[in-house]
Amino acid sequence: MTPPPAKRQKRNEYRKANTAVADDASEIRLPQKKFYRQRAHANPFSDHQLNYPLSPAHMDWSSHYPAFVDPEPSHTNLAGTRKLLKDVEVVDIGCGFGGLLIGLAPLLPESLIVGMEIRVSVLEYVTARIQALRSQQQKLRSSAIPSESSPAAQQPQQHHQQQLQATETAADAASPSSPDATGETLSLVPGNYQNISAIRSNTMKFFPNFFARHQLSKIFICFPDPHFKARKHKARIISETLNAEYAYALRPGGLLYTITDVEEYHHWVLRHFGEEGADAGQNAGVTELFERVSDEELEKDDCVRVMKEATEEGKKVTRNKGNKYVAVFRRKADPEWPA
């Protein structure tokens, strides 16, 4: 039997060793991206072996957000799995290596954020990265709480809660809103990365299977594959059909964020949201459901800053001194039915 290529074997050995270290819990290491290499793109029209729920009410989120699982065991969904205390409301479509998820986690600590990625190895990296960051935060929290053998541990429980809150407040003030380029954090951050996760999914096919009507408050589409060839435009993640699905899942007042370094793709986005160059009747439905957010509002939105600076593609564009084109659209209230 022919052995696997040397590079692939090395990657497999690294992942096994990394899993052993994680199980040991004596040392917490962040995963190395070089051991999770994969092709830059995946064909969304291929029949990938994907697991997806029958409906949003069948989706099992409990394994993704264990800190938010409803403590009442009888509260289960249609699939019989435990419900969460709150719904997922922020989605990063095509999350890549998870830079935006990591950046948004401390910025939106009370919101559950999920990344959707179709590539297997990339998803494995993001999952390992999130688990490592959670373990780091747990270790920092444990070191911040006095041990039971110390004199301080004999004080009332109320004092413990006040001390922990003071520690977290100081950490929040001292730490930046997002980690550095390596993803390492040396202090506690709001939410402790318990509010982020990633799933493997084909958004073009199964987006409505995961999210109910008006469930989402934010959707991010960061540096999507531009598919330059005209015959590939049907694979673009922004289209009339997909925009209708995004509008279905977004609640009124919710925001859809887009950013790209390709100017032609930026104009494609504007056309498909009825902002420029479209026929009056072509995108009539879209213009009834979305309106573009002004540049003045975007300057005050921290999510736009994170979207530009925290993603891996955004950092690469900055290094190459390229341009970043941002467009954000607000979901309007549903139009009234004609009498």
UniProtKB/Swiss-Prot annotation:
Family under the similarity heading: Belongs to the class I-like SAM-binding methyltransferase superfamily. TrmB family.
A GO CC annotation recorded here is: nucleus
Q: What is this protein called?
A: tRNA (guanine-N(7)-)-methyltransferase
Compartment(s) of residence = Nucleus
Sorted UniProt keywords:
Methyltransferase, Nucleus, RNA-binding, S-adenosyl-L-methionine, Transferase, tRNA processing, tRNA-binding
Q: Has the keyword Thylakoid been applied to this entry?
A: no
Q: Which organism is it from?
A: Aspergillus clavatus (strain ATCC 1007 / CBS 513.65 / DSM 816 / NCTC 3887 / NRRL 1 / QM 1276 / 107)
Show the active-site residues.
D225
Q: Which gene encodes it?
A: trm8
EC annotation from Swiss-Prot or TrEMBL: 2.1.1.33
Q: Which Pfam family would be a valid example here?
A: Methyltransf_4
Class of this enzyme: transferase
Q: Where does S-adenosyl-L-methionine bind?
A: G94, E117, I118, N202, T203, C222, T311, E312, E313
